[in-house]
Amino acid sequence: MKAAIFYGKEDVRIENVEVPEIKSNEVLIKVAYCGICGSDVTAFKTGNYVSGLIIGHEFSGIVEKVGTNVRKFKKGDKVTANGYIPCGQCKYCLSGKPSLCDNLEMTGITINGALAEYVKLPEHVVYKLPDELSLLHATLVDPLSNVLHAVNLSDFKPGNSVLIQGAGPIGLITLEVLKRSGAGKI
């Protein structure tokens, strides 16, 4: 399969690599679309990802194959995934704070990502998509979830005035979420 592999500062190469083999708890996904995140751009400019890994974590695709212990998915399901892969066993995971996981893996940053024809991920970070959501639009699920999380953590209330710094994808999604949530002056 073809994949975009990060080698360092301003060094990403399209190469042919083997389709990943899955373990019993993993899902093999045929990637339909993969976005390029601001973190990918920063890594390209600075070289701060792990060399030799396939990049990409904002993606959508179709389940191609499931491991023997996978129960929630079948071949043909439309899916996306959380780019954070917590261990589920450390003190942070057990206290409901998986983003602080001591053993956190990150798709496309510490393990192979989705800017490829296929990606494999553990079942617990894969999510089914509704039929009415296109695979193209589903590439925005990751940035949208970050925005929703940030707004939910804030003290925002309808009618509040808000300041959004930055007009990239996250800023624009934040604008839409706040408008639809009843923000006053933006």
What are these regions (language model features)?
Residues 37, 72-73, 82-127, 131:
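Cysteine-cluster motifs in flexible loop/terminal segments that predominantly coordinate metals
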Residues 2, 26-28, 161:
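Residues that mark the start of a beta-strand
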Residues 39-45:
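Cytochrome P450 core scaffold surrounding the K-helix E-X-X-R motif
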Residues 7, 18-19, 51-57, 107-111:
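Short Gly/Pro-enriched turn/cap motifs at secondary-structure boundaries
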Residues 20-34, 47-91, 130-132:
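Glycine-rich beta-strand-centered segment in the early N-terminal region that forms part
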Residues 133-186:
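Mid-domain Rossmann-like dinucleotide-binding core that forms the NAD(H)/NADP(H) cofactor-binding site
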